[in-house]
Amino acid sequence: TDVADRPEFADRRTTREIDGQRLTGWFTEDFTWSELSTLRARERLPQVRGASTRFDGRYPLVRLRDLLGMLAEAAPAPSGVPVRLVAEVKHATYFASIGLPLDELLAAELAPWAAAHPGRLVVEAFEQTVLGQLQQRGLPAEYVYLLEKAGSPADLVARYGRAALSYAGHLTTAGLARLRAAGIDGISVDTALLVKAAPKETDRPGSAWHSIGGGLAASDLVDRAHAAGLGVYTWTLRPENRFLPAPCRVGSTGAAHGDWHSWFGALMRTGLDGVFADHPDLALEVRAAL
C-alpha cells in the first residue's frame, strides 16, 4: 500500500518480532478499519511487474466481508462450478498472543457465508493449531495445511522450541497419516517440494525424486499424500525467470518471462489437485493443453 507515503501514519512505523523474525514497518493491528480504508493498493513487485504499477493508487483495500459479498454475487465459472473461497490464516499464534484470536474472529465472519454456500470454503494455514480451533468451532470447510520446504511451524516452535516437529517431519508417510487422522483434508506445499531442477540423487534406488525430462525431477509426494487420503495443492506458479528453476529460465533478465509453460505443465503432471497462480490465465492455458 501507500502507507509509507502517508505522513499521518509516520509514527506508526515500528519494529516487532513475529514468528521469530524481527520486522520493521506498519502493522495492521495498529490501525482502525477507518484508517486502513484510506490506504490505496500498490504493486508488490514493481521491479518485476512494472506494467502493473499503472494501477498503483487507484484501488482501496478489500475487507473479507466485502469479498464475501462479491462471491455471493459471482457467476459460476464457465464449467458451471461455483467460485470457491480459499481463506489463508496468517500468523495465528502471534495474533493470539496480542489478544486477537483469529479462530474466533474468522469463524464469526465466515460461518454464515459457509452455511449459505456449502462446499465453497477452503481454509488453509501454516499452523495446524488454528485449523483445529476452527474445526472445533464447527466452521464447515475443507481444511488445508500449508507447508514450507524448510523450517518448522510457528505454533509448534512457540510450544516446543527446538523440539518442534519440522515441516519435513510432517511430510513423511507417517506424518501425512497423522495429518489426515487429525481432520486435515489436504496439504499445500512449496513448488520445490514437487518439482525442481534434477538433484544428484534423481532416479537412484530409494530416491524420492525421478527424472521427468528437461532437466527437471518430480518427487513422490503427491502419490504419498493421495495414498494417505489428502488432496495436494502448490504455490505459487509465476512466469518470471526469477521464480523459475534454472532449466526453465530464458535469458538473464529476472523480470522476463521464461519457459513457464514447461514449468507449469511439469507441476500439473504430478497429479496434484490444484495450483495457486499469479497469472490464472496462463495456468488455465497450460491445463487445457495437458
Language-model region placement:
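Metal-dependent phosphodiesterase/phospholipase catalytic core, i.e.
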Residues: 1-151, 155, 161-165, 175-176, ...
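C-terminal active-site rim and adjoining tail of enzyme catalytic domains
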Residues: 96, 137, 142-290
